[in-house]
A protein has these predicted regions:
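N-terminal intrinsically disordered/low-complexity leader segments
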Residues: 1-28, 139-156
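Terminal helix-turn-helix DNA-binding modules in bacterial transcription factors
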Residues: 37, 41-45, 49-54, 74-113, ...
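Basic/polar phosphate-binding segments, predominantly the helix-turn-helix DNA-binding elements
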Residues: 10-26, 50-86, 107-132
Length: 156
């Protein structure tokens, strides 16, 4: 999230270099930078396991309730939602990385219980099934096959 200086407040004056988009200042009650970094690294490294909020709170050296509140302020969503979003992002990378990988293998690699759970969560967060997403975004297999592009017109 970025902040922009109100143009009316600087009418007739050039924008100082520091007033171009700047990072959002630290929000009151949010996680410290080191807590965000350690939490994100732990989540990314352990997506295939069952991650618990108690485990994440211990990494941030906070109580579960304080961690959950600070996490929501820092990330804009609860820890469980963030972890699920990261699992689906990992699933997207795996789906595109190898055409032969099954959705069951993808699910297990992302810490989901089975293919049905992957499909449910994928559809909920992305809006389409993993198979439909794969067909849309996969790379062309053969030289004669053109990539699928959204809103592309067919050349005549």
């Amino acid at each position: 999230m970025t902040l922009l200086v109100d143009a009316s407040a600087t009418a007739g004056r050039p924008f100082p270099p520091y007033s171009i988009p700047v990072p959002n200042p630290v929000l009151s009650g949010s996680l410290a930078a080191w807590q965000v970094r350690h939490t994100m690294l732990h989540i990314e490294a352990n997506l295939e396991t069952a991650l618990q909020v108690t485990e994440l709170a211990a990494i941030a050296q906070l109580s579960v309730s304080h961690f959950s509140r600070a996490f929501r302020i820092s990330f804009g969503q609860p820890p469980h939602s963030y972890v699920m979003a990261q699992r689906i992002e990992k699933a997207k990378r795996l789906i595109l990385s190898d055409e032969r990988i099954t959705l069951a293998e993808v699910a297990l690699s992302c810490g989901l219980s089975d293919q049905a759970h992957l499909c449910r969560m994928f559809r909920k967060l992305v809006g389409v099934t993993p198979a439909a997403w794969r067909r849309t975004y996969r790379l062309p297999i053969a030289a004669h096959e053109s990539p699928v592009l959204p809103d592309a017109t067919v050349p005549s």
